[in-house]
From Swiss-Prot:
Species of origin: Mycobacterium marinum (strain ATCC BAA-535 / M)
Major enzyme class: ligase
SUPFAM superfamilies documented for this protein: Acetyl-CoA synthetase-like
Biological process annotations from GO: Actinobacterium-type cell wall biogenesis; fatty acid biosynthetic process
Identification of the protein by name: Probable long-chain-fatty-acid--AMP ligase FadD30
Gene (name only): fadD30
GO cellular component, one term: plasma membrane
EC number(s) stated in the UniProt entry for this protein: 6.2.1.-
PANTHER family linked to this entry: DISCO-INTERACTING PROTEIN 2 (PTHR22754:SF32), DISCO-INTERACTING PROTEIN 2 DIP2 -RELATED (PTHR22754)
Gene Ontology MF term list: adenylyltransferase activity; ATP binding; ligase activity
Amino acid sequence: MSLISKLRELAEVKPDHEAFVFTEYDTRSGDRTSTLTWRQVYVRASNLARYLNSLNDDLERQKFAAICAPQGIEYIVGFLGALFAGWCPVPLPEPQGGLQDKRTGLALLDCSAAVVLTTAKDEDAVRATLAAYSLAVTTPVIALDTFEVADVSPSGAGDVSDFRPPEGGMYLQYTSGSTGNPRGARISLENVEINFRQIAKAAFPYKGTEVSLPRSTVSWLPLYHDMGLMVGLFIPVYCACPSYFMSPAAFVRKPIRWMRMLAERDQPFTAAPNFAFDLATSRISDADMSGIDLAHVSAISNGGERVQPNTVDSFLERFSRYGLRPEVVKPSYGMAEAVVYVAISEVGTPPVSTEFDAQSLANGHAELKGPDAEHATRLVRYHKLDADPLVRIVDPESCVELSPGGIGEIWVHGGNLSSGYHNVDNALNKEKFHATIRDKSPGTPRSPWLRTGDLGFEWDGGFYIVGRSKDLIIQDGVNHYPDDIENTVKEFTRGRVAAFSIADERSERLVIVAEVKPTGPASGSSGVELPLVKKRAMAALSRLHGLHVADFLFVPPQALPKTTSGKISRSACAKRYLSAGFEQLEVPQ
């Protein structure tokens, strides 16, 4: 059943049941909850759809409706209202200043938004963004929180049966832009339905041979992010269960809110990127967890950035005493071009990680850590390559499928894949989304394959991820993965780190930029610790990775540019470094 049909069914058979419940913390009047029932969602989206269709009678051209609103129920209404109108929703962040606004402006420019859906408090900021990117000053900007039913004319508002939106539809999901400017992947509602089925089969627990769907979802992920949209909107609709959500800032300020919300809800499913698990482990105290039981949690997906085995271990060790079962935590892999999901750890088993010889990985081939290996790299295992969607490891140059252990590009084949990027040359879309394997294994489709740009290898029936091909650092002919370098440095700096290379006329120069707190034992507050931290980190990079560091900078917290999904943007870091844009902390000599 399509997303639209499912919404209509829920509005008719569960009209007064909770659908979307948003909790806003720390308001002047305390914590505040906003709720929409299934009928209210359908009627409000229908009213907005009528109004959108009254703005323009041009049915020949695909119309894009950008949603630039804060986290909340208005975002849900805006996204669904655009779909109901037959328009193409474009989920984007609200204007907040800085690099994120640049990405929003570039996306608005790229899709030529015919309308922008926001809230009253952000209306002026949205108009300023439109003006900054020379977009039409006549572009309608609609404040969803003050939009009245009376605005719908002449049809007016009515019951569920009064409005039948088109069944098909698509939206533009802009990539996070971790290695360049964001691009809008065209995602159809058929892609979404297929991806939901793939997630349900792979991530949710089983009762016998039947999938046991979650009875609620819990999320703090932004709704403009692919994973946030899946957990906060799509899964609740397909599972006919309520969505409980908060803002990302509410979680970061007090991570315990995530655990409390999970404990309060019925068999919840949730997801978050790796850093959130670190944050929860380090910032939630035993006193915070008093009375909290996590035994009923359906599944917790760790995805959106590279999953660190140490993070998974620490999270399970920390919260297993509160009933969290190991098999519930699911390392996952995905991307916007695949709706969100590509692979996950095996069903019904705890997360698995394996130690590989670091030098072998640097040389382009995986080998298990031997007894004499000086340094090992521990990687998380993902499910078998023949699961749905299919995954293959392919030589990016020859397009030949590699044998187990060979490090190559991860290619994906399945019905959840985007048809291509919006407003991009057909040749590039063909190369990216319709790749062909020249020498393939039996049973492997020749095409079409999505080239992910990620590097990995097959091992013992599953596969492992080692990094992004665009981020690869090559020094003295040896490949180095920035995630491994950053993890080594973090052991000493205890903060976020970016490792990237700058090319000169002879070679690639490795640059490290590390965030440190202005006070504390590793921060240099006494004027002594920073030089020692730097010395130890550089010695470890030399000893464990055989790397020479050309420059090592300390910067304040939050100085490293991030993508819209919260990942460090190494390409933006490199640009800022070259323009001397980092505010460095002084390191006494």
